Every structure is written in C-alpha cells, then in structure tokens.
Amino acid sequence: MVNLTAAEKTQVTNLWGKVNVKELGGEALSRLLVVYPWTRRFFEHFGDLSTADAVLHNAKVLAHGEKVLTSFGEGLKHLDNLKGTFADLSELHCDKLHVDPENFRLLGNVLVIVLARHFGKEFTPDVQAAYEKVVAGVANALAHKYH
C-alpha cells in the first residue's frame, strides 16, 4: 500500500497518462543495465549486452522494458493493493528467477530519472515526491515474497 494524498494520486495519474510506455520502458530498463551492469546477468538470454550501445539497441531489452512499465502502470490502478497486484510477479522473481530484490529499488530510481528527463519542468518536486513513494511501494510489493 502506498499512502498518497488525493493530490499526489492525481499528479501520478495525470503524468502517467502522458507516458509512452514503449519508449520510456525501454529507456528505463536499458539505463538500469548500463548503470548497474551486474543486473545484466538476469538478461543474458537477451543476446549481446556487452556494451552500453549494445544494451541501448537490444530489441529484447526494449521489449521487456515496455512489459515492465505496462505492469507498473497496472499497479498504479491498484495503489491500495500493490502486494496483491504484484504477488505473482514477486513469486516469479523470487522463486524462479532469483532476482536480488534490491534491483527493484534500483529500477524504481532509474524510472524516476527517466520520467524527470522526459517531462522536465512538468516533473516538479511534488510530482517527484509522489513518484518516489510509488516506486518504493512497488519495489516493496515485488520484494514481498522474499520476506
């Protein structure tokens, strides 16, 4: 559960309505893999991830980034039940993929940076504060199965 004021929920929803999930999802996942290269080990089956350029142009990375942000967007519809919304993904990432739950926090941080880059002045400190709460809540929900 994420405790947002009505104004914060409106800010999050309004901005998300403008997000190009395909573009920003690919950018967010690509940035995660470039900035935190140890995360690449979970995506070795995606092909060449040996350089930043290879990551940034890898079709499988871009497609998976879109998938990730699509799921994130679904979570925004259920802010009062994030653990339930992400229960299956939490189980998958814990039991099958063995992803370090810290990576969820890192991806959330990268997503905030990508949103700021794309929305500039529209991504005010208040909007950032609301998104920081949301990405922390989503990361916590995805890590839930680990506890």
UniProtKB/Swiss-Prot annotation:
<dbReference type="GO" id="GO:0043177">
    <property type="term" value="F:organic acid binding"/>
</dbReference>
<keyword id="KW-0813">Transport</keyword>
<feature type="binding site" description="distal binding residue">
    <location>
        <position position="64"/>
    </location>
    <ligand>
        <name>heme b</name>
    </ligand>
</feature>
<keyword id="KW-0408">Iron</keyword>
<dbReference type="InterPro" id="IPR009050">
    <property type="entry name" value="Globin-like_sf"/>
</dbReference>
<dbReference type="InterPro" id="IPR012292">
    <property type="entry name" value="Globin/Proto"/>
</dbReference>
<dbReference type="GO" id="GO:0019825">
    <property type="term" value="F:oxygen binding"/>
</dbReference>
<dbReference type="GO" id="GO:0005344">
    <property type="term" value="F:oxygen carrier activity"/>
</dbReference>
<dbReference type="InterPro" id="IPR050056">
    <property type="entry name" value="Hemoglobin_oxygen_transport"/>
</dbReference>
<dbReference type="GO" id="GO:0005833">
    <property type="term" value="C:hemoglobin complex"/>
</dbReference>
<dbReference type="GO" id="GO:0042744">
    <property type="term" value="P:hydrogen peroxide catabolic process"/>
</dbReference>
<feature type="binding site" description="proximal binding residue">
    <location>
        <position position="93"/>
    </location>
    <ligand>
        <name>heme b</name>
    </ligand>
</feature>
<keyword id="KW-0479">Metal-binding</keyword>
<dbReference type="Pfam" id="PF00042">
    <property type="entry name" value="Globin"/>
</dbReference>
<keyword id="KW-0561">Oxygen transport</keyword>
<dbReference type="GO" id="GO:0004601">
    <property type="term" value="F:peroxidase activity"/>
</dbReference>
<keyword id="KW-0349">Heme</keyword>
<dbReference type="GO" id="GO:0031720">
    <property type="term" value="F:haptoglobin binding"/>
</dbReference>
<protein>
    <recommendedName>
        <fullName>Hemoglobin subunit delta</fullName>
    </recommendedName>
</protein>
<feature type="domain" description="Globin">
    <location>
        <begin position="3"/>
        <end position="147"/>
    </location>
</feature>
<comment type="similarity">
    <text>Belongs to the globin family.</text>
</comment>
<dbReference type="GO" id="GO:0046872">
    <property type="term" value="F:metal ion binding"/>
</dbReference>
<dbReference type="GO" id="GO:0031838">
    <property type="term" value="C:haptoglobin-hemoglobin complex"/>
</dbReference>
<dbReference type="GO" id="GO:0072562">
    <property type="term" value="C:blood microparticle"/>
</dbReference>
<dbReference type="InterPro" id="IPR002337">
    <property type="entry name" value="Hemoglobin_b"/>
</dbReference>
<dbReference type="GO" id="GO:0031721">
    <property type="term" value="F:hemoglobin alpha binding"/>
</dbReference>
<comment type="subunit">
    <text>Heterotetramer of two delta chains and two alpha chains.</text>
</comment>
<dbReference type="InterPro" id="IPR000971">
    <property type="entry name" value="Globin"/>
</dbReference>
<dbReference type="GO" id="GO:0020037">
    <property type="term" value="F:heme binding"/>
</dbReference>
